[in-house]
Amino acid sequence: AAHRRRPRVRNRDRGAGLNTAGFVSGYRGSPLGGLDRELWRASKVLDQAGVRFQAGLNEELAATSIWGTQQANLFPGVQVDGVFSLWYGKGPGVDRSGDAFKHGNAAGTSLHGGVLVAAGDDHTCKSSTLPHQSEYSFIDAMMPVLNPSNVRELIELGLRGFALSRYSGCW
């Protein structure tokens, strides 16, 4: 479902007369271990939709890359109106990326960009060394939290989340 959201954002942007691109980066690991595999599998669809997937060397570098996408319009020669971006990772990655989240969120998003952050929490510590509930880390970084409860809401809140990110400037 996550890889289907990117083309929908770009299609909505095109309908509004915008030429945007997408960027996805994060770090593999359970409970999101299959997301990057699905993104690689959908690479042709994503490429055709103007969405680049770049797996991160680690969570923090992935978050820093996301931050950079929101600065694209600060440089001459940019070919898009904005870049909408998705970071993904699990609880320890959220912890590791705190500085990039705080500074990226404080810097804001580009007018036609936007950032969503997807955290795969392991509340029962089934596949992680420590249990996680990332909402508190996001609150600490002053990042709004959306909590979809099913796939339909994941897609709908993803679309609305990018619109909210653009409007508010928040990640």
Predicted segments with their positions:
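Internal alpha/beta core interface subdomains
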Residues: 151-171
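Thiamine diphosphate
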Residues: 1-158
